[in-house]
């Protein structure tokens, strides 16, 4: 459990409500199912039953979930991409009054490509109790189903919808060896994959859709496949660059310069780039010295 109030006795947050499960006042980040209603944890249900207020993106969507588990007496507040400062302040007022607040998204884990982070930042600043419950998300199941390396991966949110932004985003992956996970929409995924194939020639691309639902499917992308009929939630998983690809020191100069600009030491950046590219640490180190000078 993430405790963000350093060196503070948790009892100061205790809510006076008593029941089968006692929870202290504060903000609880509660994951919700991404497709199958049964993919909710017992602890998440405990929090939803015990909380005073449920903060959600859409009261209709959250209302259906609560009703499915016979939780019908909860006050619901909308907090989404269109939320204003007054909406955030209203929630903070409840928290400072000692209320138990559950923050949920329409589907999956709150704050993952989802509104809510501004509220969390303020909660941390004010020293209000905060905890995040583990639970459903689309990222890890997609990575598991892809069959691509999962020891190192990067989640990049939604792939850009505009052409230049998409190309720039994909170009930035060229010299990186970890697996990449992105969200995309059914109407854009064919174009996105075509651009990825053009720029990252030879990389494996997996499309995973409808995770945990009846028509869950993993597709190995091929330009010949007709994807016009794809529906549902889409996750795109992209293979990283093979470390066996021959790269020159000139190829990694942007990586070195970027690391130097971030203030990384020559030793650290040499280790990091060697791990990603397979080049010798000593060669990278010496080349970085020349660039630094």
Predicted regions span which residues?
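General beta-strand structural signal in soluble alpha/beta enzymes
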Residues: 56, 132-135, 182, 207
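Glycine-rich, flexible N-terminal cofactor/catalytic loop recognition
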Residues: 6-80
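Class I SAM-dependent methyltransferase SAM-binding "motif I" and its flanking Rossmann-like core
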Residues: 118-176
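Alpha-helix capping/helix-boundary segments
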Residues: 60-62, 108, 138, 188
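Glycine/small-residue-rich loop that forms an oxyanion/phosphate-binding "nest" at active or ligand-binding sites
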Residues: 88-137, 141
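Short active-site oxyanion
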Residues: 48-54, 127-131, 179-180
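A contiguous loop/helix-start segment that scaffolds small-molecule binding in enzyme catalytic cores
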Residues: 12-13, 24, 100, 179, ...
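Conserved helicase motor
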Residues: 79-85, 159-160
């Amino acid at each position: 459990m993430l405790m963000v109030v350093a060196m503070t006795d948790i009892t100061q947050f205790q809510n006076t409500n008593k029941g089968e499960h006692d929870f202290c006042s504060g903000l609880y980040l509660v994951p919700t199912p991404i497709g199958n209603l049964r993919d909710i944890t017992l602890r998440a249900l405990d929090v939803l039953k015990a909380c005073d207020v449920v903060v959600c993106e859409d009261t209709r969507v959250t209302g259906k979930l609560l009703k499915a588990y016979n939780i019908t007496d909860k006050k619901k507040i909308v907090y989404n991409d269109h939320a204003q400062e007054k909406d955030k302040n209203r929630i903070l007022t409840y928290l400072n009054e000692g209320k138990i607040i559950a923050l949920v998204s329409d589907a999956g884990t709150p704050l993952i490509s989802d509104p809510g982070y501004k509220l969390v930042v303020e909660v941390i600043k004010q020293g209000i109790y905060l905890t995040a419950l583990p639970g459903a998300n689309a990222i890890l199941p997609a990575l598991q189903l892809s069959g691509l390396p999962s020891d190192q991966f990067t989640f990049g949110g939604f792939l850009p919808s505009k052409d230049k932004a998409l190309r720039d985003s994909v170009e930035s992956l060229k010299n990186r060896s970890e697996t990449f996970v992105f969200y995309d929409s059914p109407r854009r995924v064919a174009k996105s994959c075509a651009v990825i194939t053009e720029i990252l020639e030879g990389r494996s691309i997996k499309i995973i859709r409808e995770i945990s639902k009846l028509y869950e499917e993993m597709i190995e992308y091929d330009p010949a496949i007709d994807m016009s009929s794809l529906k549902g939630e889409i996750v795109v998983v992209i293979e990283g660059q093979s470390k066996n690809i021959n790269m020159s020191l000139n190829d990694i100069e942007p990586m070195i310069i970027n690391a130097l600009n971030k203030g990384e030491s020559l030793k650290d950046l040499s280790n990091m780039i060697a791990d990603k590219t397979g080049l010798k640490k000593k060669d990278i180190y010496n080349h970085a010295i020349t660039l630094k000078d």
